Amino acid sequence: MTSTNLDFSQLAADIKLWGRELGFQELGISDTDLSREEMFLQQWLDSGYQGDMDYMARHGTARTRPDELVPGTVRVISVRLNYLPVAARDSWETLDDPDAAFISRYALGRDYHKVMRAKLQALATNVEQRIGDRKSVV
């Protein structure tokens, strides 16, 4: 199927369903006009709120102009994935235990980036199979 004869409302609903099936807690689909957000990001960076996260200021407008990063971009799919393992011990319980070490929550499970990339690639594959004539970038 090509994108010219797709029901885009149904495609959006399917993408959100696939996202839930893959374990994403939230999934949003937006266009590529982030001009308003670009202004807020620049104010945030100018205020130094990024702290030591120097990467936040790198790459100029590539964060807010998706078409500059990947020419031809028409939509952006954003997802949220909790990475706190369900079986993680309560933080305060661990801190109160002199015989236990406290490990940052992000380090308790499998590498978040690997988990996220695999799930995003599965989502991209579903999208590409449905639309046929477009490419997804993870």
Predicted regions mapped to residue ranges:
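Auxiliary alpha/beta "docking" domains used to position bulky ligands
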Residues: 1-138
